[in-house]
Curated annotation (Swiss-Prot):
Ranges of Polar residues composition bias in the record: 28-51
A single BP term in Gene Ontology: resolution of meiotic recombination intermediates
Membrane is among the record's keywords: no
Protein name, per record: RecQ-mediated genome instability protein 1
InterPro entries given in the database record: RMI1_C, RMI1_N, RMI1_N_C_sf, RMI1_OB
PANTHER family noted in UniProt: RECQ-MEDIATED GENOME INSTABILITY PROTEIN 1, RECQ-MEDIATED GENOME INSTABILITY PROTEIN 1 RMI1
Family statement drawn from the similarity comment of this UniProt entry: Belongs to the RMI1 family.
GO molecular function: nucleotide binding
Coiled coil: none
Record note on disruption phenotype: sterile due to extensive chromosome breakage in meiosis I.
Keyword terms: Meiosis
The keyword Cell inner membrane is assigned to this record: no
Gene3D superfamilies tied to this protein: RecQ-mediated genome instability protein Rmi1, C-terminal domain
């Protein structure tokens, strides 16, 4: 008896054959109605149905896709076996045979026995009278549950073995696969996780699994239904796919997106995208060792869950035996990210806590981590930190002494708390977008809440109050206007608090450039140069003013455009290119003082002046500031409070 294979054909040259040779098998499968997007249309030989126009009612037994010859039914048997088991089939421990699994297997879904047992028991508990539903309804509920399960854990393997070693082979399918990761290989690593429309400039690479082996697919022609930022764990169905050197060549005709996602993989993908899209951080670390971007991305994706210990990828050729996290790490490893990653880091712990890793642990432990949060998280943290700071100042001042001498310090602390707390309540949701990280460390304030002894309680209280404001209070209240430089975090905090009352704030920042995000000057009257600047407290985007750029280049943007527009090489063209090259080297080597202005008209802080290096005057001012701070701290008697 000739065996029959059920196939999904999406090729345009085979649709005409299906219109003339479709039998009742396709109609029977479509009657299940599990998902409108994956109703198969099968074709069989013409001798099985001499009248193509007539529908043949075929029972569910006859459409089971089997391998090998079925065992003949005894002639004296009046009742056929509803779901026969054929001797040619090798039933493994993970296979699960039931009418429901047969329905999903015809669509290209093969799942493990453990998943079926768990899913059916859960549905019987959650859905009333689930056991009385027909096979189609039960299969529909199981399919809905499957869409949000991780095939790395529940997949039984629907692909033929050793796909990675195949070449010039067409796999008929259909195969339902889970997409763990999508990257745009038409861009460098920094741009691979940015959304891009389907077109000739985009080439997606998909890391997919059927639960047993990892396969990769390439977007051979633009597929509009696939997106770079699609959720991890997306389910797709492929059929009649060409394999070239182990790579699935994906075209729109053979790919259909079903949907779904896996929550754990999606959270890891989001953390990875945030890490990759962060601005450059420069090359400064404690020991001068800078981890690669792929290493940082891997740690960002899988080092935040302290409960997942020991999950790693054990690569055995084409087969992957791991958990969901391991397969996702394997997915990233094929994009240049290390394979063996153990997730042991807890997000609530300090960032300098050592991370556990099998391959990159030695490197990562030497890295100075710099956490850069989003603007919304910054707003909430700033609000809470300001309140905790003001409350600590109030407690510190209240312990300095009693009587009229302490009342001045306490009232000053209360006014500071009310001022900062009230303004921060209104400004929490309006924190400037370019501020990515701002920490107000309250630990040092709490250290000053010990008892202070001295002969003059009033003088000590006033001196103590000044010290607290100098350490932790914002520079808004500082009376020293002759500072050698300030910090971006401090200046950003000042602008966030006072932008409703003043038009702009300025500050001198000692910093260096870590990269250039955008430089435009053609066909416009001004330069637009957006740089990444790091001053040790914050990394943010700063816009260099047109006058600053024009002063360094020596020509306006229109003059540069006119000199570079000539196709023939001239002396003016060569001179302009040389000046632009010198300006590029100046930006690459810049480390000095910037005068930064924050105002309402600009989205970014504007650098209105920049000077290479640090002057001797600034060094003397900084030295005097350090000496005055040391004299203030030395006038207080250090008291060590030992716990009982």
């Amino acid at each position: 008896m000739r065996r029959r294979r059920l196939q999904l054909r999406y090729s345009s040259d085979e649709e005409e054959e299906d219109e003339t040779g479709t039998s009742g098998v396709g109609d029977s499968v479509q009657s299940f109605g599990i998902a409108s997007s994956i109703q198969p249309e099968t074709s069989v030989s013409s001798n099985s149905n001499p009248n193509p126009g007539e529908r043949i009612a075929i029972s569910e037994v006859e459409i089971i896709d089997v391998f090998g010859n079925p065992q003949p039914t005894p002639p004296d048997s009046s009742i056929p076996t509803p779901y026969p088991v054929y001797p040619s089939e090798s039933v493994s421990g993970n296979d699960y045979e039931s009418p429901i699994s047969e329905v999903l297997s015809r669509m290209g879904i093969k799942l493990k026995r453990e998943w079926w047992v768990s899913c059916l028991s859960g549905l019987e508990t959650s859905i009333p009278q689930f056991s009385y539903l027909d096979v189609a309804a039960k299969a529909k509920h199981c399919f809905e549950q499957f869409m949000f399960f991780d095939m790395n854990l529940c997949g039984g393997g629907v692909l033929p073995p050793n796909v990675a070693s195949m070449n010039r082979i067409e796999l008929a399918g259909p195969f339902v696969l889970q997409v763990d990761e999508i990257v745009n290989i038409g861009c460098p690593l920094k741009g691979r996780y940015e959304n891009a429309n389907a077109g000739l400039k985009r080439c997606l690479k998909l890391s997919m699994t059927d639960g047993v082996q990892r396969v990769f697919g390439m977007e051979y022609r633009p597929i509009k239904d696939l997106q770079v930022l699609a959720p991890a764990g997306l389910k797709i169905v492929v059929s009649s796919v060409q394999v070239r050197h182990g790579l699935l060549m994906l075209v729109p005709e053979i790919v259909e997106v079903l949907g779904g996602m896996v929550e754990e993989l999606e959270e890891a993908r989001k953390r990875l995208v945030v890490e990759v899209n962060k601005p450059p951080r420069g090359k400064r670390t404690r020991v001068g060792v800078v981890p690669s971007l792929t290493t940082r991305a891997t740690l960002a994706a899988w080092s935040l869950n302290g409960n997942d210990t020991g999950n790693h990828v054990h690569d055995t050729g084409n087969h992957v035996n791991s958990s969901a996290s391991g397969n996702a790490s394997h997915t990233q490893a094929n994009q240049g990210i290390p394979v063996h990653v153990t997730r042991t880091h807890n997000s609530s712990r300090a960032m300098d806590e050592p991370l556990a890793s099998t391959n990159v642990g030695a490197t990562v432990s030497r890295v100075e981590h710099m956490q850069i949060d989003t603007a919304s998280a910054h707003g909430e943290r700033t609000f809470s930190d300001i309140h905790s700071t003001s409350s600590n100042i109030h407690r510190a001042a209240s312990t300095a002494g009693t009587g009229t001498s302490c009342s001045g310090a306490c009232s000053g602390a209360r006014s500071f708390a009310n001022n900062v707390g009230g303004n921060s309540l209104d400004q929490t949701s309006n924190v400037t977008s370019f501020v990515e990280e701002m920490h107000i460390d309250t630990g040092r304030v709490r250290d000053t809440t010990t008892h202070i002894y001295g002969s003059d309680s009033g003088g000590v209280a006033a001196e103590f109050s000044n010290m607290v404001v100098d350490l932790e209070g914002p520079s808004v209240l500082s009376t020293n206007t002759e500072k050698p430089f300030t910090y971006l975090a401090e200046l950003s905090q000042k602008w966030a608090v006072m932008k409703d009352t003043i038009h702009f704030v300025q500050g001198r920042i000692k910093c260096f450039l870590t990269g250039v995000k955008k430089f435009q000057f053609k066909q416009q009257s001004t330069y637009e140069l957006l740089c990444y600047v790091d001053d040790g407290s914050l990394i943010c985007e700063i816009l260099l003013h047109n006058d600053v750029v024009q002063k360094r280049i020596g020509h306006s943007s229109m003059e540069v455009t006119a000199a570079l527009s000539s196709s023939a090489p001239t002396s003016l063209n060569a001179m302009m290119k040389e000046k632009l090259k010198r300006f590029q080297l100046f930006l690459a080597d810049f480390e000095g003082i910037m005068v930064v202005e924050m105002n309402r008209s600009s989205q970014y802080p504007v650098a209105i002046e920049m000077n290479q290096g640090c002057s001797l005057t600034d060094a003397r001012l900084l030295l005097d500031r350090i000496k005055s701070s040391s004299r203030t701290s030395s006038s207080l008697n250090p008291v060590v409070v030992l716990s009982p």
